[in-house]
Amino acid sequence: LLWRMNRRRLDVEAWRDAMLAAAGKLDLSLGGAPAELYKNDNVRRTLYGRIDRSDPDDVLRLFDFPDPSAHAPSRAPTTSALQQLFVMNGPFMLRRADELANLLTADDSATPETIVRQAYRRVFAREPSATEKRLGVEYLAAELASGKRQAAVARYAQALLGSNELLFVD
């Protein structure tokens, strides 16, 4: 008998949609013309993205999107340094982190503890553990002392959006 499922990494499409949803930007409208996914700040579901067979999107290729000009019964998952560089420096990730930070700091009176709790609810749909809450509050308290509230919360949001918990299904 199996008592648990092996961890699996989300496909890039589901991961992109999860980040857009956490940032409150995912456009759930049905139908319509396909659009470039990572250009012009497209926030439609990835399902509606335009795929060019001769020139697939660089971000999709980076995260194991199959060659659209050939049959691919499964994807060969890879892990590369470029993937983590995208998480740390990619314009898409930075925009999502800023948008999530805007949601978390909409109330100027929000305490670091409130921000951490709201962030975990939005990103992971759960409450943070005591350790996660303590570490998040300590980080935010130290960063907020610099007076750059939005930037501090955006960095925290980016760390959560780039975490394994969002990328993998347990």
Language-model regions, residue ranges each:
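Amphipathic alpha-helical segments in structured regions that serve as interaction surfaces
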Residues: 115, 119, 135-136, 152
